[in-house]
Swiss-Prot record:
Pfam families: Ribosomal_L37e. It comes from Spodoptera frugiperda. One of its GO terms (biological process) is translation. GO terms for cellular component: cytosolic large ribosomal subunit. Zn(2+) binds at C19, C22, C34, C37. This is Large ribosomal subunit protein eL37. A zinc finger (C4-type) spans 19-37. PROSITE patterns: RIBOSOMAL_L37E. Binds to the 23S rRNA. Belongs to the eukaryotic ribosomal protein eL37 family. InterPro entries: Ribosomal_eL37, Ribosomal_eL37/eL43, Ribosomal_eL37_CS, Ribosomal_zn-bd. Coiled coil: none annotated.
């Protein structure tokens, strides 16, 4: 048996299928682990040696439905309640 080019044509079973968390076809069926996001691990798979991959998946690349509101509130000092009434200017 050879282990090179001729044996690659005989491979016909899928090793990976769709991942439920990241949606990529990186979920290894026998290992029961995603090669992309690390599912079923609680934390997302990310490494410092792949800076470009971190840039693709980091905070700010998606909707940020809640965080963009928090960012705006942070700039204004997390003000709450009614706005302060304007002081009447005395005309002289």
């Amino acid at each position: 048996m050879t282990k090179g080019t001729s044996s690659f044509g005989k491979r016909r079973n899928k090793t990976h299928t769709l991942c439920r968390r990241c949606g990529r076809s990186s979920y290894h069926i026998q290992k029961s682990k995603c090669a992309q996001c690390g599912y079923p691990a609680a934390k997302l798979r990310s490494y410092h040696w792949s800076v470009k991959a971190k840039r693709r998946k980091t905070t700010g690349t998606g909707r940020m439905r809640h965080l963009k509101i928090v960012r705006r509130r942070f700039r204004n000092g997390f003000k709450e309640g009614k706005p302060t009434p304007k002081k009447a200017v005395a005309s002289s």
